[in-house]
């Protein structure tokens, strides 16, 4: 419908999506733009929480920057974001709290002054505060 096309056009513009046609399949887009399509579909539902699994895996550096800006905008608007990532830079740059899991259990919780690269690496390797 015309309303659906207008909504899609606005969402594509809001997300700075690069595409040849709104009718093009998402599989024809770059990794970063394909991720934006997925996020855009969820944002149409006005979620209070987004769950993301390695959201920038396989995405080029430029698209990662745009994606990070989008996530920051969403959190500034009140959307909570919970995501899994194996990218330390991503965790340190975007998160205000990181849970390090091992075998399904929380090994460590890092936030505030404890959320540093050295603590993140140590927790990932299984080192306790006393051993650091």
Question: Where are the regions that the model predicts?
Answer:
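Glycine-rich phosphate-binding loops of nucleotide-dependent enzymes
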Residues: 1-132
């Amino acid at each position: 419908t015309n309303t659906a096309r207008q909504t899609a056009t606005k969402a594509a513009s809001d997300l700075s999506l690069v595409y040849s046609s709104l009718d093009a399949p998402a599989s024809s887009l770059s990794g970063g733009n394909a991720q934006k399509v997925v996020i855009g579909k969820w944002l149409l539902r006005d979620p209070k929480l987004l769950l993301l699994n390695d959201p920038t895996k396989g995405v080029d550096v430029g698209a990662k920057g745009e994606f990070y800006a989008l996530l920051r905008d969403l959190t500034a608007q009140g959307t909570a974001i919970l995501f899994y990532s194996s990218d330390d830079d991503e965790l340190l740059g975007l998160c205000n709290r990181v849970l390090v899991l091992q075998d399904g259990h929380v090994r460590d919780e890092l936030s505030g002054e404890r959320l540093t690269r050295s603590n993140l690496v140590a927790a990932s390797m299984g080192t306790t505060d006393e051993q650091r």
